[in-house]
Amino acid sequence: MTVKEFLNRYDNEERFDEQDLEAIFDLDFYEDEDDKVYIIEEEYDEPRRWSRFHTRWVEINGRYFELNADEGLTEYQDTEYMIQPQEVTYKQVTRTITVTENEYSYIERKK
């Protein structure tokens, strides 16, 4: 599937089958020279007994998408791709965290 085919199918609200979802998650597109496809960030949930949830945020031609996979953690567990891509907004945010602590110091006693 090309990048433009993916975007067109997404915009037309077509459902992707599991094979398509795997290719999309792996960013396995046929790209033209002007296509821009990047992974922005990835996050893994805590491993469960047999699998872990993997979320990937990507930029595809200036649009941002969340992609998901349930990755098998053993050679007997397949990775499953069941969740459809979801377009998201993206912005970098700088946050400042204020920490309040208690301080104690000794008082000198008068003699």
Q: What does each of the following model-derived ranges do?
A:
Residues 2-38:
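Negatively charged, low-complexity tracts enriched in Asp/Glu with abundant Ser/Thr
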